[in-house]
Design a protein with these regions (language model features):
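The feature captures the beta-strand-to-loop junction immediately N-terminal to the Walker
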Residues: 45-47
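ABC ATPase NBD coupling module
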Residues: 76-96, 121-122, 141-142
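Short coil-to-helix segment of the ABC ATPase nucleotide-binding domain corresponding to the Q-loop/switch region
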Residues: 102-111
Length: 166
């Protein structure tokens, strides 16, 4: 059930309208609408095979919808590649581990921060230090992702997702 009008894009940062995804004759996502306000965090709940991950993949640009559109700040981004959406702040924190196990914690974050052309190298370093402190992983800065506990890995994933200031 929708709690707000999907056509009211002015108050929303991200809107997905009428998303469909079909693989052959199998419909895996059927007419999904999502509206996310700036600074809002959302999750989708549902049974296995309901299309939750596929919906997030369409929003982030990992896969193209069969039908439907995605808007970010009133601009249609449906056909934008994933890297352009990421630069605009569209991100997804997957339920499966997504940090690079052979990279250090520091380099996992730097990988994203280096895409921030709006930040100087010094500002990138300050952002890195701040996020490591905020998530209590400064002491793990030089540790490889594959050596982290589940909770540490999750905190690094969240810190990395915030590198783009979504």
């Amino acid at each position: 059930k929708q709690s707000r009008k999907m056509s009211d894009q002015k108050n929303n940062s991200l809107i997905a309208k009428g998303l469909h995804k079909k693989y052959g004759s199998r419909m895996v996502v059927n007419n999904v609408d999502i509206s996310v306000n700036r600074n809002e965090v959302v999750g989708l709940l549902g049974p296995n095979g309901a299309g939750k991950t596929t919906t997030f993949y369409m929003i982030t640009g990992m896969i193209k919808p069969t039908k439907g559109d995605i808007f970010l700040d009133d601009k249609k981004i449906t056909l934008d590649p994933m890297y352009k959406r990421a630069r605009k702040g569209v991100g997804y924190l997957a339920q499966e581990p997504s940090i690079f196990s052979k990279l250090t914690v520091e380099n996992n974050l730097k990988l994203v921060l280096e895409m921030r052309k709006d930040l100087s190298i010094q500002e990138q370093e300050e952002k890195l230090d701040g996020l490591l402190d905020d998530f209590s992983v400064s002491s793990l800065r030089g540790s490889k992702g594959g050596n982290l506990s589940g909770g540490e890995r999750r905190r690094v994933e969240i810190a990395r997702s915030l590198c783009m200031d979504p």
